Every structure is written in C-alpha cells, then in structure tokens.
C-alpha cells in the first residue's frame, strides 16, 4: 500500500531471525514468502520479527501460514514477534494467534527456544 517493505535476516543466539518492516500486502508478500520459505527449509526454529510491520493483509498472513507449514514439514517451527496492536488484533480476529501466537519481544521468543533446548540464556 505504498510503504516499502524491508526484510533483513540475521542470527541471534543461534536462531535465524527475519526482521520485517513496512507493509506486507499483495505487492510485497511474495518477497517475504520466498525469504521465509528459504529459511524454513533448514528445519530449525525460525523467528519472524514483525514488530516494525504497520500493515499486513491476507497475502501476508498466507505467507506466514505457508512458512509455518514448510518449517513443520522440515522439522522446524515458525515463531512470530509482534507488539503492535493493529497486527496483533488482526492475528486475533483471524484466529492466527492460535496457530502462531505472537510474542511481544524477540527476547521472549529466544528465551523460550533456549529453555526448550536446555541451553543457558
């Protein structure tokens, strides 16, 4: 919807983190989907940090669901970070929060992943 989408991937505490900023819509969702699918195929937990996303439409939600399915098919998982009330509300309204419960901070997700594998934080 006009605002550019930026997608940056890095590793934090040994986990791939994809930070997304801007608007995810029909025009930009394919880029996000491709990047998430690439990292989801590795078969490890993957974090999508959507905290800087101001808008997401059904194409963006579909990209997240597809990435979660791909990660699960390869033995991994997708975790979402989102503190913004608009995006969190959309997750609630669509029921996506039951499939991909959004964490409020990146540290919250990483702490949980580290605890699950028994590693010190």
Role assignments for model-derived ranges:
Residues 1-52, 66-121:
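STAS-like cytosolic regulatory interaction modules
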């Amino acid at each position: 919807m006009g605002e550019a989408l930026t997608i940056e991937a890095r590793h934090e505490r040994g986990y791939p983190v994809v930070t997304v900023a801007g608007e995810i819509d029909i025009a930009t969702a394919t880029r996000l989907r491709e990047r998430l699918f690439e990292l989801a195929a590795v078969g490890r937990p993957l974090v999508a940090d959507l905290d800087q996303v101001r808008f997401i439409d059904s194409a963006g939600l579909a990209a997240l669901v597809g990435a979660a399915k791909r990660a699960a098919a390869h033995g991994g998982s997708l975790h979402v970070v989102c503190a913004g009330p608009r995006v969190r509300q959309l997750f609630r309204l669509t029921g996506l929060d039951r499939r991909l419960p959004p964490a409020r901070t990146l540290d919250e997700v990483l702490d949980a992943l580290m605890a699950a594998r028994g590693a010190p934080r």
